[in-house]
Amino acid sequence: MMPVTLSGAFYYPQCPTTFVWKNVDESIEKKNEWNEGQVYANGNRIIFWLNGYTLGDETLDPKVHRISKSGNIGIQVHGGDQFKGMQVAFQNIDILKIKPGDPPSMPVVVVCKELVPLP
C-alpha cells in the first residue's frame, strides 16, 4: 500500500511492504510550500519529523542492517509517470555532528507511523 503522501516516508526496498513508515496524514505536508524535515540518525536509531510531527522512530537491528560510521548522505526524489511535473527543491540544509547516545533535539511522539515489520 502506498503512503498517502511520500514526504517523510522511510523507503526501504528490502522491507516486505517497501516502506518502514509512511505519512498517512496528508494534512501534515504543506502543498506547494516549503516543508521542514528533520532527521535524527544515531547508531542504529532513525527518527524523522515533518513540520514538527514525528512520522517514525525506528531502531534497526545491526545484525541485519549495515550501520555506517561514515559516508555520504543522500537526499533524493523518485520520479515516475505518477509524478509528472513534480518539482523538488532544498534549502537551508544543516548537518550537525552528534555523539553516540545524544538524545534527539525534538520531542518524539509518533503520529503517523504504520507499523511495518522489518526483515
Model region roles, listed by residue range:
Residues 1-119:
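Carbohydrate-interacting regions of secretory-pathway proteins
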